[in-house]
From Swiss-Prot:
Annotated site residues (Important for catalytic activity) in this chain: H221
Note on cofactor: Binds 1 zinc ion per subunit.
Keyword Zinc: yes
Active site residues of this protein: E200 (proton donor)
HAMAP family: Adenine_deaminase (MF_01962)
Residues that coordinate or bind substrate: D279
GO biological process per UniProt: adenine catabolic process; hypoxanthine salvage; nucleotide metabolic process
Main function: Catalyzes the hydrolytic deamination of adenine to hypoxanthine. Plays an important role in the purine salvage pathway and in nitrogen catabolism.
GO CC terms, sorted: cytosol
Species this chain originates from: Rhodopseudomonas palustris (strain BisB18)
Top EC class for this record: hydrolase
Positions annotated to bind Zn(2+): H17, H19, H197, D278
Cofactor: Zn(2+)
The protein, known as: Adenine deaminase
Length: 343
């Protein structure tokens, strides 16, 4: 391990854009399939990992939803969430904010209570055993109807105090944010923070819709905003966080090579950019691997890496007091490692 990799791995980082269903490592997926009497198309973890080659977002989603089928019982959700949080802790993550999309599971007959108990139980374990700050976000699917999303909003209300935000993901093209304007107003009216996947494959107009019509607190991805200079200025002025996922963008052909990733351009234009994993096993890395890939391909300085990490801590859905504690952890780490304010 190089000094830089050790430094980055040790930084107290965030992962603000990660899907529990997309965090199933290949061997665990096979184990869960066996536990639930299922037969996958792949017999070994190596063969399954070899299938993680995608042409676009939809080709990934096809495999993603197939993987969801191995999550059936409360223990399955607990094991997957526990495994991710353990890996995140080992990677130096101090604040993790996890999406889960219950619609994929409840439509197959999985009780929402089983899903929530499994996920929340693993989160409580991580707080107790690792001192990890962790929050849960409920994501609705944009390829479904707004009425479906409203039903899900009603169903999750018994867990309102344990949910930090409402989000939306899935195939962007043909599913603009405006389709869910009433749903997000209802979520805000019920006191939820909000965030939306926009500008990953969709245009800058989708990012603007998320910001102006849905009035979200954060944008997930957001890369396409660069096509609209006025939108960039508004995002920068309002300090709207963008939860960018570099390795995800590379694997899904959003960029042809990491050297062409817009992350550094976004930073240069004053956008509040954070680096996250999205679906780490599918895309080849946790937060450290994402930062290292950007460092190498985009020639990021240590100062720029620290700035990205600080942005994540500032963008987290936490209280002011919790944020101060997290930022103090970063400042203490930098002081111990004698990191200068310039590279």
């Amino acid at each position: 391990m190089t000094d830089l990799e050790s430094f980055i791995r040790g930084l107290p980082k965030t992962d603000l854009h990660m899907h529990i269903e997309g965090s199933i490592e290949p061997q665990l997926m096979l184990d869960l399939a066996a536990r639930n009497g299922m037969k996958l198309r792949w017999d070994t973890a190596e063969a399954l990992r070899g299938a993680y080659q995608f042409d676009n977002l939809q080709s990934f989603l096809d495999l993603y939803f197939e993987g969801c089928k191995v999550l059936v019982a409360e223990g399955d959700f607990r094991d997957v969430t526990r495994a991710y949080l353990r890996r995140a802790h080992e990677d130096g993550v101090v604040r993790a904010e996890l999406f889960i999309g219950p619609q994929s599971f409840t439509e197959r007959g999985t009780p929402l209570e089983a899903l929530m108990s499994g996920v929340l139980g693993a989160m409580q374990e991580a707080r107790r055993e690792h001192g990890l700050s962790v929050g849960l976000m409920i994501s609705v699917h944009r390829h479904r109807t707004e009425a479906d999303a409203m039903v899900m909003l009603d169903q999750i209300m018994p867990w309102k105090d344990q949910i930090i935000a409402i989000g939306m993901g899935g195939a962007e093209l043909g599913n603009p944010p405006a389709k869910f304007a009433r749903f997000f107003k209802a979520a805000r009216d019920r006191g939820f923070r909000t965030t939306v996947h926009a500008g990953e494959e969709g245009p800058a107009a989708y990012v603007r819709e998320a910001l102006e019509l849905l009035q979200v607190d954060r944008i997930d991805h957001g890369n396409a905003c660069l096509a609209d200079p006025d939108l960039v200025r508004e995002l920068a002025m309002r300090r709207i966080p963008l939860t960018v996922c570099p390795l995800s963008n590379l694997r899904l052909k959003g960029v042809t090579e990491m050297a062409r990733h817009p992350l550094k351009t976004m930073m240069a234009q004053g956008l509040h950019v954070t680096v996250n994993t999205d679906d780490p096993p599918y895309f080849g890395g946790y937060v450290t691997e994402n930062l290292l890939a950007c460092r190498e391909a985009l020639d990021l300085s240590r100062e720029e890496i620290v700035r990205l990490v600080r942005n994540g801590l500032e963008a987290a859905f936490v209280t002011t007091e919790e944020r101060e504690i997290l930022l103090r952890q970063l400042d203490d780490y930098l002081a111990r490692h004698a990191v200068a304010s310039t590279s």
